[in-house]
Amino acid sequence: MRSFTTLNGLAAPMDRPNVDTDLIIPKQFLKSIQRTGFGANLFDELRYLDKGEPGRDNSNRPINPDFPLNFKRYEGASVLLARENFGCGSSREHAPWALDEYGFHCIIAPSFADIFFNNCFKNGILPIVLDEEIVESLFVEMYQTEGYRLVIDLPAQTVTTPSGNSYSFEVDEFRKHCLLKGLDDIGLTLQHADSITAYEAERAKRAPWLFAASE
């Protein structure tokens, strides 16, 4: 998993509350269990004027000219500014996969759905909760400023705006450690590989019948 320390990223808006995981990545794209291939269909029902299908070439599809992520000013955005209860709905892990592959490494909102919030950390995305008034002020500044970039400092736990305003955020120490080190569940397990190997070797000595090859 990619590590996260500081991010100086262009911000883009998702200016609606209660964005659910089906809107983030529609159900017809959930057939794959691979982590890749979902970014092209992130917010598919909002980005395009027709219905997307798995394996379809998106280059010829009609785009929605009113959807902000289709605006040139938000190309390459890595910070998503959202409203309350972002990521509600089903617990599909494909949602953070799609956001990450599209290029979003941080999401700022007044609140998140719990399962989505946890899944973000497991996939290298930093979800930041800020007061609703602060989020509103960020939306106002972003709409007024083309090329609006936010500096996300995970070690210091701050979000800094182009105007110099800095806002602190809370993050669980263990989750912070995992993001800083780029550790997902597999990475955490591999940190104890020597201990696991030693345990298995000792267990094989004590109960060899469990490890005997079947004839």
UniProtKB/Swiss-Prot annotation:
Its EC number is 4.2.1.33. Belongs to the LeuD family. LeuD type 1 subfamily. Gene3D superfamilies: Aconitase, domain 4 (3.20.19.10). The gene is leuD. Pathway: Amino-acid biosynthesis; L-leucine biosynthesis; L-leucine from 3-methyl-2-oxobutanoate: step 2/4. CDD domains: IPMI_Swivel. Keywords: Amino-acid biosynthesis, Branched-chain amino acid biosynthesis, Leucine biosynthesis, Lyase. One of its GO terms (molecular function) is 3-isopropylmalate dehydratase activity. Catalyzes the isomerization between 2-isopropylmalate and 3-isopropylmalate, via the formation of 2-isopropylmaleate. It catalyses: (2R,3S)-3-isopropylmalate = (2S)-2-isopropylmalate. One of its GO terms (biological process) is L-leucine biosynthetic process. HAMAP family: LeuD_type1. This is 3-isopropylmalate dehydratase small subunit. The keyword Lyase applies. It is an enzyme of class 4 (lyase).
